[in-house]
Amino acid sequence: MIGKLKGTIEEIGEDYALVDVHGVCYVAYCSARTLSRLGSVGEACILFIETYVREDQIRLFGFMAVLEREWFNLLQTVQGVGAKVALALLSTLTPSELANAIALQDRTAVSRAPGVGPKVAMRIVTELKNKVPAFAGEATNIGFKQELGEGVAPAPVSDAVSALTNLGYSRDQAANAIAAAMKVAGDEADSAKLIRLGLKELSR
């Protein structure tokens, strides 16, 4: 099993990188986000690898960080999510954004990834809700044990996150701040209170 490649970028394709390791070139399939950060042809690179062995082929999937590789595997525990969809999700959302979307039960954010329809998005946010803490690490500050509804974030939460993003904060910052606000205000808080507490959190 190959766990990591350390070599030189030989080629970057639409969904893969060709890495030369001491004269042997390996094809590693990667998310668009990983490919964009990898560097240029001729530069040194390091990829953490997940190896898939099938009867007729061996495929390598490459990641810039171990956390991304863990999410790749976690996502595929959901019915309907294979390697291609998992990479599409990681191309669209960072691990932190995925953790936030799952904690907020925000299937709309998850369904932004190509190949992820409403049913698969709902399965992802539902089935992974209680599995995320083991993989999130420091990717998010959200309290994962909160019950935020079925399939979509409650209106006050969505409104509060939207309000903070309209003020110039990233969705990741806004979601983290509102999650922290909910710990203080409780699940029944209205959007105005969540926004106020969220801004207080962001000002720290």
From Swiss-Prot:
Key word Disulfide bond present: no
Keywords, ordered alphabetically: Cytoplasm, DNA damage, DNA recombination, DNA repair, DNA-binding
Ranges where the record places region Domain II: 65-143
Biological-process GO terms, alphabetical: DNA recombination; DNA repair
Chief subcellular location: cytoplasm
Pfam family, one: HHH_5
Subunit structure: Homotetramer. Forms an RuvA(8)-RuvB(12)-Holliday junction (HJ) complex. HJ DNA is sandwiched between 2 RuvA tetramers; dsDNA enters through RuvA and exits via RuvB. An RuvB hexamer assembles on each DNA strand where it exits the tetramer. Each RuvB hexamer is contacted by two RuvA subunits (via domain III) on 2 adjacent RuvB subunits; this complex drives branch migration. In the full resolvosome a probable DNA-RuvA(4)-RuvB(12)-RuvC(2) complex forms which resolves the HJ.
Similarity comment: family membership: Belongs to the RuvA family.
UniProt-recorded name of the protein: Holliday junction branch migration complex subunit RuvA
Organism: Rhizobium rhizogenes (strain K84 / ATCC BAA-868)
Lineage, opening ranks: Bacteria, Pseudomonadati, Pseudomonadota, Alphaproteobacteria, Hyphomicrobiales
Gene name tied to this protein: ruvA
